[in-house]
């Protein structure tokens, strides 16, 4: 129970209030690297798509959702997802393994320290 008290103490001193939030039972959560969030040359869409790919990945080491599925879940268009994925690939945050016509791609998520590659 010591860890629970540590969490309670942390919540008392933070500037963000998590009302009614239980990360264990609320459908999970996704950790996103701060260096990705702070990378000014990446668009907002690219950062959100990377986070979405991470949310799929925690079940195993391979991620292969369809772009249409991601667009529907994120409330955006498939072309926006396609551009964001290309941007992430150009900057070294992911590698795309194409599996052929009519099949979803496999996305290898990478961790880039610093600025990443500029495409």
What is the predicted role of each segment?
Residues 66, 99-118:
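Short, cationic-aromatic polyanion-contact patches
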Residues 90-98:
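A short, conserved structural fragment
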Residues 1-80, 87-89, 102:
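Short recognition helix of helix-turn-helix/winged-helix DNA-binding domains
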């Amino acid at each position: 129970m010591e860890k629970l008290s540590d969490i309670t103490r942390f919540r008392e001193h933070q500037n963000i209030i998590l009302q009614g939030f239980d990360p264990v039972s609320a459908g999970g959560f996704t950790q996103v690297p701060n260096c990705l969030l702070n990378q000014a040359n990446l668009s907002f869409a690219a950062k959100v798509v990377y986070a979405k790919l991470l949310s799929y990945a925690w079940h195993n080491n391979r991620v292969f959702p369809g772009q249409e599925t991601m667009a529907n879940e994120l409330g955006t268009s498939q072309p926006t997802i396609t551009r964001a994925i290309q941007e992430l690939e150009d900057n070294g945050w992911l590698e795309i393994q194409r599996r052929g016509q009519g099949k979803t791609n496999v996305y290898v998520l990478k961790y880039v320290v610093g600025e990443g590659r500029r495409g």
